[in-house]
């Protein structure tokens, strides 16, 4: 999403550089050659015309899936736009280019085991790339957390990851999560997506 400040500056420049209507008086000393005004308008049209058509996807975790993290679109503010598709729980990249890829999961639990030597609980979340260039899933983003031994009462741990990658048309983005039983599945806490830059 474009920050609001980035929208106002090009709009203001376009208004300032636009030629005045016939017969209108401009500010003294603020005349620009007609070619400069035309170039500014063309740049604005190019910027705003293409920015709305960039591929974007935002998926949320499916709370009905108990034994795996399944992604869903077209619900709870989730969407697939301008070429992205979801197939076999993977995002299919519609065109080659730079993409910001991101994901978040939130884990929760009632507490650690009260045993003298509690069993460690490891939580992990990874975004993977499957491409025609590789014969296996390549980790793009990876994070781990260890909870036990630790809190005696309820606990919550969140993992957010995001970075820019050069992706190729047809690449598949998927996730792998350890600690599925501890996922706190809600649209605002468990999500996965990508958008073209």
UniProtKB/Swiss-Prot annotation:
Localization per Swiss-Prot or TrEMBL: Secreted; Membrane
Lineage: Eukaryota, Metazoa, Chordata, Craniata, Vertebrata
Described function: Cytokine that in its homotrimeric form binds to TNFRSF1A/TNFR1, TNFRSF1B/TNFBR and TNFRSF14/HVEM. In its heterotrimeric form with LTB binds to TNFRSF3/LTBR. Lymphotoxin is produced by lymphocytes and is cytotoxic for a wide range of tumor cells in vitro and in vivo.
Covalent S-S links between cysteines: 112-148
SUBUNIT field: Homotrimer, and heterotrimer of either two LTB and one LTA subunits or (less prevalent) two LTA and one LTB subunits. Interacts with TNFRSF14.
Family designation: Belongs to the tumor necrosis factor family.
InterPro entries: TNF (IPR006053), TNF_beta (IPR002960), TNF_CS (IPR021184), TNF_dom (IPR006052), Tumour_necrosis_fac-like_dom (IPR008983)
GO cellular component, one term: membrane
Signal peptide, first to last residue: 1-26
Organism of provenance: Oryctolagus cuniculus
Protein name: Lymphotoxin-alpha
Glycosylation site positions: 88
Transmembrane parts of this sequence: none
One GO-annotated biological process of the protein: humoral immune response
Primary gene name: LTA
GO MF: cytokine activity; tumor necrosis factor receptor binding
Keywords associated with the record: Cytokine, Disulfide bond, Glycoprotein, Membrane, Secreted, Signal
Superkingdom of source: Eukaryota
Major localization class: secreted
Domain THD: 55-197
């Amino acid at each position: 999403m474009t920050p609001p400040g980035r929208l106002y500056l090009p709009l203001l420049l376009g208004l300032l550089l636009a030629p005045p209507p016939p017969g209108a008086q401009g500010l003294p000393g603020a005349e620009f050659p007609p070619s400069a005004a035309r170039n500014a308008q063309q740049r604005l049209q190019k910027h705003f015309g293409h920015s709305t058509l960039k591929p974007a996807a935002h998926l949320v975790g499916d709370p009905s899936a108990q034994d795996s993290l399944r992604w869903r679109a077209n619900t709870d503010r989730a969407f697939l736009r301008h070429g992205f598709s979801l197939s076999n729980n993977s995002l299919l990249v519609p065109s080659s280019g730079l993409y910001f890829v991101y994901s978040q999961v939130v884990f929760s639990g009632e507490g650690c085991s009260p045993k003298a030597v509690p069993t460690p609980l490891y939580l992990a979340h990874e975004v993977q790339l499957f491409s025609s260039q590789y014969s296996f899933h390549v980790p793009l983003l990876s994070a781990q957390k260890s909870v036990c031994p630790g809190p005696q009462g309820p606990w919550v741990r969140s993992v957010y990851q995001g970075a820019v990658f050069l992706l190729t048309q047809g690449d598949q983005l998927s996730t792998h999560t350890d600690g599925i039983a501890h996922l706190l599945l809600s649209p605002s806490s468990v999500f996965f997506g990508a958008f073209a830059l």
